[in-house]
Amino acid sequence: EAVLGTPPNTSYDGVTFIELPGTWISLYPIEKLAEDISSEIPVIRSGFSGVTLAHNARSKDDVVNIIKRAESAGARIVKKPQETFWGGFSGYFADLDGYYWEIAWGPMFEFTENGELKFKENA
C-alpha cells in the first residue's frame, strides 16, 4: 500500500510516478538524477539539505496514519505528529533514501471536491 494513500501510477526506467490531484510526484534514484544532470556532480547523502517534501493531509488523524504507514514501510520517524507553532499539526519522517517528508494538516487549507488543496477564503 502506498504511504500517501495513492498507489504509484507507473514505474518507468527506475522512475516512480505518483499522480495526485493537480500535481505529480516523480521519485528518481539520487544517483541516476545526479548522472542525468551531469556526470561531474558528486552524490552527497549526509546531513540535512535544507529541502523537504511536504504532503498535506485532510485531518490530524490522517497525519498520524500516514506517519504510521511510513514507519511500517521502513521510514525513520524524525518528529512525531504534534501541534505546530503555526496552528497546524504535522510530523516528519526520513524515507529509505534519506529524504525528509513533512506530513501536515492546517486549519487554513481545504480540499476541493476533486481533491485539490486550496487556501480557505478569509483564513
Give the location of each predicted region.
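Vicinal oxygen chelate
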Residues: 16-19, 39-123
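Residues in well-ordered beta-strands of folded domains
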Residues: 26-28, 54, 104
